[in-house]
């Protein structure tokens, strides 16, 4: 009898720590299904909590958004950890209300490390300090970002030389990684307002700083980029690096109140 009770206790405890999404098993053919704010919270917890063996729980896992989420999401995915899986937005939109004015690396996704985020839109508002992006604050180490659209207002409270604020992406930084390859960003657009009194602001990407360079193509800004500072402000990429591979940037649509380079 005691053995049976022990068995059921172990089974219950294991079930308690398992991920509880709207469906799926996390494989490519059967991704975890994200349908509501509770699912986003579950993904946030999964991203910030290491597995039993100390590994990143989202590594090799697949997630798919099944519908628009109109209830504002106030949290972040990857606040303490980083996202290393594949997030397929399915062409849907997530409404955000992220207000973290004293925190760095703020966005729907904080850090995406060797992961992928694609086919997703966000709306609402995002407020942070340094490295603030509507969708991803900091993609790094071969992160793959494509088919992304930001409609949210993105604001940085920082006045630093590297506020790194972008409608879609805050700052691409991996200098400490040395030999790691840069991020790939393609088919991304911003329609939201981007503002800060600091430097390195862009409608799509605030700062692109990676020793090995990033690949950026087919990006456009249709929003307003505003700063009282006149340095490193641009419609699309606030601070591109010399070794970035940049192709097909739409600059004609940009509205600025400051000087810009790209």
Report each predicted region and the residues it spans.
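Positively charged, low-complexity/disordered segments
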Residues: 256-262
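Bacterial Sec-dependent N-terminal signal peptides
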Residues: 1-19, 140
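Surface-exposed repetitive/solenoidal architectures
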Residues: 19-255
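Low-complexity, intrinsically disordered/propeptide-like segments
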Residues: 8-10, 14-15, 46, 68, ...
């Amino acid at each position: 009898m005691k053995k049976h009770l022990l068995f059921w206790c172990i089974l219950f405890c294991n079930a308690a720590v398992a991920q509880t999404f709207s469906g799926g098993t996390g494989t490519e053919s059967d991704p975890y299904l994200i349908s509501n704010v509770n699912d986003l919270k579950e993904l946030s917890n999964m991203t910030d909590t290491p597995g039993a063996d100390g590994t990143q729980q989202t590594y090799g896992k697949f997630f798919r958004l099944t519908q628009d989420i109109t209830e504002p999401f106030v949290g972040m995915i990857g606040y303490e950890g980083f996202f290393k899986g594949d997030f397929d937005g399915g062409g849907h939109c997530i409404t955000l209300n992220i207000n973290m004015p004293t925190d760095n690396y703020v966005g729907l996704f904080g850090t995406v490390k060797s992961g992928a985020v694609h086919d997703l839109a966000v709306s609402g508002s995002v407020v942070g300090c340094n490295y603030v992006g509507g969708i991803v604050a900091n993609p790094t180490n071969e992160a793959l970002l494509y088919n992304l659209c930001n409609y949210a207002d993105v604001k940085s409270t920082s006045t630093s030389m590297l506020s790194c604020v972008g409608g879609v992406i805050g700052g691409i930084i991996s200098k400490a990684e040395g030999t790691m390859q840069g991020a790939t960003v393609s088919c991304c657009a911003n329609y939201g307002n981007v503002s800060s009194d600091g430097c390195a602001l862009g409608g799509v990407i605030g700062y692109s700083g990676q020793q090995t360079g990033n690949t950026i193509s087919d990006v456009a800004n249709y929003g307003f980029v505003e700063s009282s500072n006149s340095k490193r402000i641009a419609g699309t990429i606030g601070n591109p690096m010399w070794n970035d591979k940049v192709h097909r940037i739409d600059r004609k649509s940009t509205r600025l109140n400051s000087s810009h380079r790209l």
